Amino acid sequence: MNKDHEEQLEINEVSQKNKYKSIIESLLFMSGEPINIKDLATILNCKQDKVSSLLNEMNNSYVGKDRGIKILIHNRAVQLVTKPENSIYVEKLLKTNVRQSLSQAALETLSIIAYKQPITRVAIDEIRGVKSDRAIYTLLEKNIIKECGRLDVPGKPILYGTTEEFLKFFGLDSIEAIPNLEDLLKEFSKEEN
């Protein structure tokens, strides 16, 4: 094999590695959630060891640079995360955007959970008159509500309640600081008259 051919193979290998890194970065960015290394290997049609090696190279390229992200690997699952030193800025963004980013259905569902917790999805659906699966999923993803047990009836449905993040987002010291529902209803009925 001549030297030119070896150099061409090396260039092709570097190009292929960079393509894989680009794809991995896109997948991690779009997912927002941890992705198993095995799943990345399947998507890329390569071995898990190669994916692990690429991830280490990628993370090394983020370390020490003025980059705002890094790769977190835990239990063979990978996630693109912000660097801890930027957390105060990320928190500010999340606090200002959480109310704007919740749909009407999510806000209704959150209100029901806040006032009736712990409560099942079926009970929420009955109060709203429509299914609440998507709204509950969104609220769980945003860590505003959590699963807080199971109701002791056949089927053992999940009970939902609010989180510390809920209190932070709405500037409340405790769940007891939520305005009294009856007082709110009286106030709204006065405004309508």
From Swiss-Prot:
Its main location: cytoplasm. GO terms for biological process: cell division; chromosome separation; DNA replication. It holds the Pfam family SMC_ScpB. It comes from the Bacteria. InterPro entries: ScpB_csome_segregation (IPR005234), WH-like_DNA-bd_sf (IPR036388), WH_DNA-bd_sf (IPR036390). Belongs to the ScpB family. Homodimer. Homodimerization may be required to stabilize the binding of ScpA to the Smc head domains. Component of a cohesin-like complex composed of ScpA, ScpB and the Smc homodimer, in which ScpA and ScpB bind to the head domain of Smc. The presence of the three proteins is required for the association of the complex with DNA. This is Segregation and condensation protein B.
